[in-house]
Amino acid sequence: DEMRSNLAFVADFDHFNENAYFGLNDYKGNENALAMNLMYNHYFTYRSSLIVGAQAQLQYYRESLANNTPWIEAAKSRFYDFDRSEQEVGAYAEYTYAVKDKFSIVAGIRGDYNAFYDKFFVTPRGHIRWNITPSTTLRGSAGLGYRSTNVITDNIGILATGREIVIPDFDGFNRLEKALTVGGSLTQTFGLVSADDATLSFDYFRTQFYNSVIADQEMYADKIMLYNSDKRSYTDTYQIDFSWTPVERLDIFATFRYTNSEM
């Protein structure tokens, strides 16, 4: 195979508009987002390559929520203005090393400056794959990430509850979530009727939140509290997948998932 270097530029524009009415709850949301990505891919050898790039994102949100619950005694009519504009620029690098179909490792890092939060973020990530045998594959990955939440659209179902929606500290509300995800999977291919016609895989991932946005529906019977928390919070996810193709054009799938969360 020929080793080549590539230079690419990608621009993407997204427009989203939503008007939702749940009884006396009126939500209006509008988003315009522009993303530009300049990427250079260089092959050192057939086994190793490096991707470097720069990225810029412009996001304009126009959001509002009128929360009226006159049937709840002493409840206030609330109006929330979530308008904001986010500008973010950053750079990234990703190194890949592979030994044919036997082993591969990917290590990446990126740094981004977000003008809305006036913060610089560093987010490392890594992925490893090892084909232990032709029919057994082990994968592992880890990565740190940040996410600017849209608290109403992320929890749109709360508008249908008829309850008062309260953000206790609206001016100090931190919508930026930070989390670390670590996990892996083990996949085994085997034969039941014919060779390699079945696959069994086991996945485990843990997400540790360092700041999370919570829609608390348990604190009060007539209110939903929206707030951010930097307390211990995590999610453990276990999943088993089974697939089998006993005959051509017939596929059988079965999945079991167990999730354990603490907030």
Describe every region a protein language model picked out:
Residues D1-D118, L192, D196-Y204, F253:
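Face-selective signature of the C-terminal outer-membrane beta-barrel domain
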Residues E2-A20, N131, R139, F173-N228, ...:
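Membrane-embedded beta-barrel scaffold of Gram-negative outer-membrane proteins
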Residues V10-D12, N19-D26, E63-W71, Y117-P124, ...:
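Outer-membrane beta-barrel translocator domains and adjoining extracellular loop/strand segments
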Residues R47-S49, F82-T207, N260:
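Structural signature of Gram-negative outer-membrane beta-barrels, strongest in the C-terminal barrel
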Residues A98-D101, L200-Q208, N228-M263:
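Gram-negative outer-membrane beta-barrel transporters
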